[in-house]
Regions:
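Short amphipathic alpha helix immediately N-terminal
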Residues: 88-102
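DNA-recognition helix of helix-turn-helix
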Residues: 114-134
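Short alpha-helical "recognition helix" segments of helix-turn-helix
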Residues: 108-113
Length: 134
């Protein structure tokens, strides 16, 4: 059983997952950059510098784990929704995917499906009823 609220949540979480992915990439870059050698000469590391770099790397790794945990939760919800949506008719699946997964507006969904705006909402209500029963 999938509710409208879960679908809305999925739409929001999908955007959050994209943002988290970008943050993970940034963190991975910070984990690489501190250990780079200076171009002007030999690397000069004092014990204080080494401790600071180690602290930055440890914090970055902690944040990376937090982000991956969040992405894992998002993927669990996505799997649950995908299983339920798979039981819908093709045009219903398309409507759900365009609006909730691709993040299109209702107007854009109507254009993509070559439906009237009102017709997309009728079909959406049918989808929600079927998903609630599933």
């Amino acid at each position: 059983m999938i509710t409208k609220n879960e679908l809305r949540l999925y739409r929001q979480l999908k955007q959050e997952a994209k943002e988290l992915s970008e943050q993970i990439e940034e963190l991975e870059m910070t984990m690489i950059v501190p250990g780079c050698q200076q171009i002007t000469g030999m690397p000069v590391y004092h014990s204080e510098d080494h401790d600071k770099i180690a602290n930055v790397l440890a914090k970055a790794e902690q944040m990376r784990k937090v982000y991956f945990d969040k992405v894992d939760v998002l993927l669990d919800l996505q799997e649950k929704i995908e299983v339920a949506v798979a039981k819908l008719e093709p045009k219903e699946r398309r409507l759900i995917r365009l609006y909730y997964f691709a993040g299109l507006t209702w107007e854009e969904v109507a254009v993509q499906m070559d439906y009237a705006w009102r017709q997309t909402h009728r079909l959406h209500n049918i989808c929600l009823k079927k998903l609630k029963m599933a």
